[in-house]
Design a protein with these regions (language model features):
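N-terminal secretory signal peptides
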Residues: 1-9, 20
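C-terminal segment of N-terminal export signals and the immediately downstream linker at the start
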Residues: 13, 28-44
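Hydrophobic h-region of N-terminal signal peptides that target proteins for export
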Residues: 22-26
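N-terminal mature-domain "stem" immediately C-terminal to a signal peptide or N-terminal signal-anchor/transmembrane
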Residues: 37-71
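Aromatic-lined, polymer-binding surfaces characteristic
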Residues: 76-323
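Extended polysaccharide-engagement surfaces of secreted carbohydrate-active enzymes
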Residues: 275-737, 741-749, 753-760
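C-terminal beta-strand-rich structural cap/linker in extracellular carbohydrate-active enzymes
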Residues: 664, 777-797
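Small-residue (G/S/T/A) turn/hinge positions that recur once per unit in extracellular repeat modules
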Residues: 766-770
Length: 797
């Protein structure tokens, strides 16, 4: 499928796009200042939720509305109230059945209130919606019920849907039903939930709770509830230095120890966008200046993690295991593209509260993602209701150029993640430390994510012949297409069919682990602190002191992210588990029956349509196999359908119980066979200066680069460090820049010596003290405790 581009718009389409675009700009204050502010806010919420400025008879809206009507009719036909359920097979215990029931009633409500569904204003449909609401209110979702099971269903999932239904059907419910809905929310989301910023009331969860309370304030005409919801957002805004929330380096953490920008981060971004827009211009407008941090996060925290419409699974936590959910009537795959597109749609919502300059930049990025996502085209993505489609189409049709994916390196040190973007490829790295968990499981999800933080390196070649056409969306079909640059490597049934002991880039003990090893909710964390790196914004040195989950394995792993390659070093690989230890050079999903050729050369291997690897030492082992699995294997809430995918695995075997084993290899995503062979034959391109348990360092003369990760005080080539540090030196003509960080995060001052003649100091961060120049450069760095990069630039002599 080719990239989806807007066709030449008709005059009517232009007018509709203009109307929708207007809804993304400043919200008219007059509307909120109407004689009845609660009605004004309710109507504004419906505009946000149900959409405005679109033609229901035009595509893609007509089809989407017709589908909504068809689902509503199916739900009506199968609704069968009993004391323990509203639909057969979905009991109220566990309480996910309650949220499920409200979800179906919301679909029926959409069909009733929206034009073009074939059920608009149908009195029989309304009667059944009211019957369902009354049944839930009478049997389970009321102040007389004591919560059981998963708290989220009671305090976020169900009240959010109940408030939306109540807002949409307000004129048809009568005072008693509205009062009952408000009383239920008051019971399950009491004011105390929005008090202390702790427990389950932080980050994205806090925003969700505020959303329900704000709507309860609107529908119950309760100004104190609106004020409470607004004020309870303020703790979400500031940057945090530990626990849940946004960090100054763009990291987003939820559940205290889990990198979660892609799912919980999206929920927070979307929820804040809706609440900012809802309350703008009213007496409850969000005026806290910390709101700007949220707006800044679009470009600092979220956009760097999005590649061609997907958000990297390294920040999706346990959601990587969902795929097709049993409870999803739409049967849409919860993939990296699904989650990424949800973030893109959230940006469109948040644009309503952004400045003109911010809105212009965001729109350019969104246009680019719309053009480049060929896996599940965004403008017809099946998960979106018409409201999101209208906002996205308005952006696509508006003037302005689409922005390309920017090159650069983003080190998210607070969540042990790194993203590297180059013209030829994009890569993401996941690590773990005493701050960030190996993985998260919980609620029956992701029980085998054990090694996803063991140095997993995921990458996409930009423009490489892909030979694969796996789709997410409703079919999930896969095959060969030869299309270049498809970004479905981790979308096309990757997680249910991958060998969980052979995740790409990881070093692991092959000791078998039980499901949920280490505990749930981010409990398993290694007792290591040296995880992080340094970057000049273009290249980077990143390292991980690895301790295996449920294992005696220890290793030091380093990655040097360069122009067209990632140099990977491992050292000190030691284990006493009595089983082999492996480093997985890569594990590529070839799709269903993939026939891409793997060609071996002297110290290299090339995979057609993907790229290649240079392995100068050790024996590179390879395996091509078909693997079969279902999403239900890794998620109890997911579908049981089984699919087979073909895999190409490359690994290094360190043997049983290795002591101080090591490795060196280079990944060249998207490289041609000829380019790979030339690089492998060039003995002068790369020199490994050190690779042991004390330091790992490389130099690449053609790039003017020398980089080192010091695990302790020591020297490597021309560099010396007095403590654990990450150092990157870039020479450009007659100048050089040194970038230094302290990944152990002790905060103690350290000294760096670069044994190279230097002249003047052109610039230096306040944290960098120049101790000497001349024959060599001698620095003292006061690093702080967040693994920040500290720079100085000097002239060469």
């Amino acid at each position: 499928m080719t990239p989806q581009r807007p066709t030449a718009p008709t005059r009517r389409a232009v007018l509709l796009a203009a109307a929708a675009a207007a809804s993304l700009t400043a919200v008219p204050r007059a509307a909120a200042a109407a004689a009845d502010p609660y009605d004004a806010l309710r109507h504004r919420w419906l505009d946000i939720t149900l959409g405005t400025g679109y033609d229901p008879s035009a595509e893609p809206y007509a089809s989407r509305l017709a589908e909504t009507g068809a689902r509503a009719r199916e739900h009506r036909a199968t609704m069968a109230p009993t004391p323990t359920s509203l639909w057969p097979g979905h009991p109220f215990d566990p309480p996910a059945g309650i949220t499920f029931a409200y979800g179906r009633l919301w679909t029926m409500t959409e069909a009733y209130v929206q034009e073009g569904t074939g059920a608009t204003g149908d009195p029989a449909l309304l009667a059944d919606i009211l019957r369902g609401l009354d049944h839930l209110s009478a049997t389970v979702y009321n102040p007389a019920t004591t919560r059981y099971g998963n708290w989220w269903e009671w305090q976020i999932g169900s009240p959010r849907l109940l408030m939306d239904i109540t807002a949409a059907l307000y004129d048809h419910l009568g005072a008693d039903r509205v009062a009952a809905a408000c009383a239920a929310v008051d019971h399950f989301v009491p004011d105390a939930m929005l008090g202390d910023y702790t427990g389950t009331s932080t980050g994205a969860n806090r925003v969700d709770l505020c959303r329900s309370v704000a709507l309860r304030g609107v529908l119950g005409r309760a100004p104190a509830k609106l004020a409470l919801a607004r004020d309870a957002l303020s703790p979400v805004f500031p940057y945090v230095t530990e626990g849940d929330g946004l960090y100054a380096d763009g990291s987003f953490v939820q559940h205290t120890w889990v990198a979660y920008s892609g799912t919980y981060g999206q929920v927070m971004l979307d929820g804040l966008g809706r609440l900012f827009t809802l309350l703008a211009g009213s007496e409850w407008e969000v005026t806290d200046p910390g709101k700007q941090i949220v707006l800044d996060s679009v470009e600092r925290a979220y956009a760097p993690l999005i590649h061609d419409g997907l958000v990297m699974d390294i920040v999706n936590g346990r959601a990587i295991s969902r795929g097709y959910l049993k409870s999803d009537d739409l049967h849409v795959m919860r993939s990296d593209h699904f989650h990424g597109q949800q973030i893109v749609a959230a940006m469109a919502v948040l644009a309503g509260g952004a400045s003109d300059a911010e809105r212009e930049r965001w729109s350019a990025r969104i246009k680019g993602w719309i053009e480049r996502d060929t896996v599940t085209p965004i403008l017809t993505a099946p998960q979106f209701p018409v409201a999101d489609l209208a906002r996205l189409h308005a952006i696509a049709a508006a003037p302005g150029e689409a922005a390309p994916e920017p090159a650069g390196h983003h080190l998210f040190a607070a969540m042990d993640r790194a993203v590297h973007r180059r013209p030829a490829f994009t890569a993401g790295l996941a690590m773990a430390s005493d701050r960030i968990a190996h993985y998260e499981c919980g609620n029956g999800e992701n029980p085998r994510g054990w090694h996803t933080g063991a140095g997993m390196l995921t990458w996409w070649a930009n423009g490489a012949a892909s030979d694969r056409s796996g789709r997410s969306g409703r079919s999930g079909r896969s095959g060969r297409s030869g299309r270049s640059g498809r970004s479905d490597q981790y979308t096309d049934w990757f997680w249910p069919t991958v060998d969980w002991y052979r995740l790409p880039g990881t070093t692991v003990s092959t000791q078998r682990l039980p499901d949920r090893a280490g505990g749930e909710w981010g409990a398993p964390k290694p007792e290591v602190s040296w995880v992080g790196g340094t970057t000049d914004g273009e290249y980077a040195a990143v390292g991980q002191h690895l301790k295996g989950l449920g294992s005696t394995l220890q290793a030091r792993k380093s990655w040097f992210f360069l122009d067209d390659a990632v140099i990977c070093l491992g050292a000190g690989i030691t284990c006493a588990d009595g089983v082999p230890v492996e480093t997985v050079v890569d594990n590529r999903n070839l799709g269903e029956g993939g026939t891409q050729a793997l060609v071996r050369g002297r110290h290299w291997a090339h995979l057609e349509g993907h790229g290649g690897w240079i392995v100068p030492g050790g024996t590179l082992r390879t395996l091509r196999e078909d693997r079969t699995g279902s999403w239900s294997d890794i998620n109890t809430t997911s579908a049981t359908e089984r699919r087979t995918r073909r895999w190409q695995t490359l690994w290094l075997d360190h043997g049983t119980d290795p002591v101080d084993a090591d490795y060196v290899y280079t990944v060249m995503p998207g490289a041609s066979r000829a380019a790979l062979a030339r690089r492998a034959a060039d003995r002068h391109w790369l020199t490994v200066l050190a690779n042991d348990g004390r330091r790992q360092a490389v130099t690449v003369p053609s790039l003017g680069l020398t980089a080192a990760n010091f695990w302790r005080a020591g020297a490597a080539g021309p560099l010396t460090a007095t403590a654990g540090a990450s150092v990157l030196v870039r020479r450009r003509g007659r100048t050089a820049t040194l970038s230094v960080s302290e990944p152990p995060r002790t905060g103690e001052a350290l000294e760096i010596v670069w044994d190279h003649p230097v002249g003047a100091v052109l610039r230096a961060d306040e944290t960098v003290e120049i101790l000497a120049t001349g024959r060599r450069l001698h620095l003292r760095v006061t690093p702080g405790v967040v693994c920040a990069t500290h720079e100085c630039e000097v002239t060469l002599s």
